[in-house]
């Protein structure tokens, strides 16, 4: 049995450098838990001159970690999609274990990698929610269960912005600037605020929970950029919080996947998750509801998850990458058949008969109102009507909103948020 495992590390940014730091600082406990010594033999970076003072070789030759026979595990922390995918394919072709934190690459290529890998281990715990061990929970801890549903706060940036808007009455623009100033949001935050990052993670979790190969373009994805303080005020008034959720539900003949802002009751555990923290609620048919909470990003939480994969590979505890012997064939639920309650915000002319017009259109689409709030806009002839509905379907609600937008008394495109009970 080998007494030492050698790592080829691709990328020495925030996460990569923290992996190196933890492997050095915690080397004794890692050795005790892995059963072997784990050392970085070589790291590959774009600019060798910027990375000095390490006890291992620094190279700018990506092929060298693949071809080096002394390297047992390649750890990819470079970012991007196609270049990491090519690295993964070449690594697995050499029957070397591969560890990645790359959610975007896995969202597009997870099934191809599983087919290439065969019995060669692939670790990707760090790809979803950083320090939360949700991958292992779905693959191992909950493997005796049918996963009935899961929903979660999968993106820390959007959760921080929504928390600031809810607690401090900040505008979306100001909350985003604050997140960027603190380093929680990128200068180009599009993937975070538009729900794409959360959707990447949802697809990976859905593969583990249901064995399906869903594509990004097949699922409903909406971001948080259209949410305004008025929406937060309505939520507070009626006992809700607003969170960007990734949601999965198993129906008898299909799987429902969606990412969007959701109003959730304050009694719901996820409503208490604030700031940059992540959390996922999973319901199994035997275990019931379980909740997983923790830091979803950052150098140390993500590096911790990367090293947990390395230790698991060192223990030779390999298993099917996505947890299913054969791909499952359940289709995705069509977007227009989604059923939930809804909230909408309308800017209208402040005149008689407007609300009766709105009520009539909702009734014609078999939509019944639950709560209503009307706000006059001072020194204008305009008002805002905010309302929530009882459960209906997506097709009916979208049709009603389209008809409402065509009313002369409705002055702007209606805004909508789904309620997740």
Swiss-Prot record:
<dbReference type="InterPro" id="IPR005106">
    <property type="entry name" value="Asp/hSer_DH_NAD-bd"/>
</dbReference>
<dbReference type="InterPro" id="IPR016204">
    <property type="entry name" value="HDH"/>
</dbReference>
<feature type="binding site">
    <location>
        <position position="15"/>
    </location>
    <ligand>
        <name>NADPH</name>
    </ligand>
</feature>
<feature type="binding site">
    <location>
        <position position="130"/>
    </location>
    <ligand>
        <name>Na(+)</name>
    </ligand>
</feature>
<feature type="binding site">
    <location>
        <position position="298"/>
    </location>
    <ligand>
        <name>NAD(+)</name>
    </ligand>
</feature>
<feature type="binding site">
    <location>
        <position position="197"/>
    </location>
    <ligand>
        <name>L-homoserine</name>
    </ligand>
</feature>
<keyword id="KW-0521">NADP</keyword>
<feature type="binding site">
    <location>
        <position position="186"/>
    </location>
    <ligand>
        <name>NADP(+)</name>
    </ligand>
</feature>
<protein>
    <recommendedName>
        <fullName>Homoserine dehydrogenase</fullName>
        <ecNumber>1.1.1.3</ecNumber>
    </recommendedName>
</protein>
<feature type="binding site">
    <location>
        <position position="298"/>
    </location>
    <ligand>
        <name>NADP(+)</name>
    </ligand>
</feature>
<keyword id="KW-0560">Oxidoreductase</keyword>
<dbReference type="Pfam" id="PF01842">
    <property type="entry name" value="ACT"/>
</dbReference>
<feature type="active site" description="Proton donor">
    <location>
        <position position="201"/>
    </location>
</feature>
<feature type="binding site">
    <location>
        <position position="46"/>
    </location>
    <ligand>
        <name>NADP(+)</name>
    </ligand>
</feature>
<dbReference type="GO" id="GO:0050661">
    <property type="term" value="F:NADP binding"/>
</dbReference>
<dbReference type="Pfam" id="PF03447">
    <property type="entry name" value="NAD_binding_3"/>
</dbReference>
<comment type="function">
    <text>Catalyzes the conversion of L-aspartate-beta-semialdehyde (L-Asa) to L-homoserine (L-Hse), the third step in the biosynthesis of threonine and methionine from aspartate.</text>
</comment>
<keyword id="KW-0915">Sodium</keyword>
<dbReference type="InterPro" id="IPR045865">
    <property type="entry name" value="ACT-like_dom_sf"/>
</dbReference>
<dbReference type="GO" id="GO:0009088">
    <property type="term" value="P:threonine biosynthetic process"/>
</dbReference>
<feature type="binding site">
    <location>
        <position position="103"/>
    </location>
    <ligand>
        <name>NADPH</name>
    </ligand>
</feature>
<dbReference type="InterPro" id="IPR036291">
    <property type="entry name" value="NAD(P)-bd_dom_sf"/>
</dbReference>
<keyword id="KW-0479">Metal-binding</keyword>
<comment type="pathway">
    <text>Amino-acid biosynthesis; L-methionine biosynthesis via de novo pathway; L-homoserine from L-aspartate: step 3/3.</text>
</comment>
<feature type="binding site">
    <location>
        <position position="186"/>
    </location>
    <ligand>
        <name>L-homoserine</name>
    </ligand>
</feature>
<dbReference type="GO" id="GO:0004412">
    <property type="term" value="F:homoserine dehydrogenase activity"/>
</dbReference>
<dbReference type="Pfam" id="PF00742">
    <property type="entry name" value="Homoserine_dh"/>
</dbReference>
<feature type="binding site">
    <location>
        <position position="34"/>
    </location>
    <ligand>
        <name>NAD(+)</name>
    </ligand>
</feature>
<feature type="domain" description="ACT">
    <location>
        <begin position="343"/>
        <end position="418"/>
    </location>
</feature>
<feature type="binding site">
    <location>
        <position position="298"/>
    </location>
    <ligand>
        <name>NADPH</name>
    </ligand>
</feature>
<dbReference type="InterPro" id="IPR002912">
    <property type="entry name" value="ACT_dom"/>
</dbReference>
<feature type="binding site">
    <location>
        <position position="128"/>
    </location>
    <ligand>
        <name>Na(+)</name>
    </ligand>
</feature>
<feature type="binding site">
    <location>
        <position position="103"/>
    </location>
    <ligand>
        <name>NADP(+)</name>
    </ligand>
</feature>
<dbReference type="InterPro" id="IPR019811">
    <property type="entry name" value="HDH_CS"/>
</dbReference>
<feature type="binding site">
    <location>
        <position position="183"/>
    </location>
    <ligand>
        <name>NADP(+)</name>
    </ligand>
</feature>
<keyword id="KW-0520">NAD</keyword>
<dbReference type="InterPro" id="IPR001342">
    <property type="entry name" value="HDH_cat"/>
</dbReference>
<keyword id="KW-0791">Threonine biosynthesis</keyword>
<comment type="similarity">
    <text>Belongs to the homoserine dehydrogenase family.</text>
</comment>
<keyword id="KW-0028">Amino-acid biosynthesis</keyword>
<feature type="binding site">
    <location>
        <position position="125"/>
    </location>
    <ligand>
        <name>Na(+)</name>
    </ligand>
</feature>
<feature type="binding site">
    <location>
        <position position="46"/>
    </location>
    <ligand>
        <name>NADPH</name>
    </ligand>
</feature>
């Amino acid at each position: 049995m080998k007494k030492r495992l050698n790592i080829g590390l691709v990328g020495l940014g925030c996460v990569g450098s923290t992996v190196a730091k933890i492997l050095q600082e915690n080397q004794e406990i890692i050795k005790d838990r892995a059963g072997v010594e784990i050392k970085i033999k070589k790291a590959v970076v774009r600019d060798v001159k910027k990375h000095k003072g390490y006890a291992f070789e620094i190279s700018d030759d990506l092929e060298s970690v693949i071809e080096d026979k002394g390297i047992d595990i390649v750890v990819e922390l470079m970012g991007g999609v196609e270049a990491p995918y090519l690295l993964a394919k070449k690594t697995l072709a050499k029957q070397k274990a591969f560890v990645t934190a790359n959610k975007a690459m896995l969202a597009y290529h997870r099934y191809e990698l599983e087919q290439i890998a065969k019995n060669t281990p692939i670790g990707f715990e760090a790809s979803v929610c950083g320090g939360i061990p949700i991958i292992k929970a779905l693959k191992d801890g909950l493997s005796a269960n049918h996963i009935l549903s899961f929903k979660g706060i999968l993106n820390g940036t959007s959760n921080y912005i929504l928390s600031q808007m809810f607690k401090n009455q900040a505008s979306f623009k100001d909350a985003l600037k604050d997140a960027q100033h603190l380093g929680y949001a990128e200068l180009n935050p599009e993937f975070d605020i538009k729900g794409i990052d959360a959707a990447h993670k949802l697809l990976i979790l859905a593969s583990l929970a249901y064995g399906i190969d869903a594509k990004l373009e097949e699922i409903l994805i909406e971001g948080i950029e259209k949410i305004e303080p008025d929406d937060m005020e309505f939520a507070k008034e009626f006992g809700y919080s607003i969170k960007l959720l990734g949601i999965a539900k198993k129906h008898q003949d299909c799987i429902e996947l969606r990412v969007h802002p959701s109003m959730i009751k304050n009694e719901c555990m996820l409503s208490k998750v604030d700031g940059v923290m992540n959390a996922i609620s999973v319901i199994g048919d035997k275990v019931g509801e379980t909740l997983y909470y923790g830091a979803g990003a950052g150098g140390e939480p993500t590096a911790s998850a990367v090293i947990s994969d390395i230790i698991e590979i060192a223990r030779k505890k390999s298993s099917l990458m996505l947890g299913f012997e054969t791909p499952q064939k359940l289709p995705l639920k069509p977007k227009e058949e989604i059923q939930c309650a809804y909230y909408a915000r309308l800017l209208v002319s402040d005149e008689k008969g407007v609300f009766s017009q709105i009520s009539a259109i909702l009734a014609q689409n078999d939509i019944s109102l639950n709560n209503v709030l009307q706000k006059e806009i001072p020194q204008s002839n305009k008002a805002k009507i905010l309302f929530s509905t009882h459960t209906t379907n997506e097709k009916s609600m979208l049709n009603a909103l389209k008809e409402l937008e065509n009313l002369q008394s409705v002055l702007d495109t209606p805004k909508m948020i789904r309620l997740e009970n």
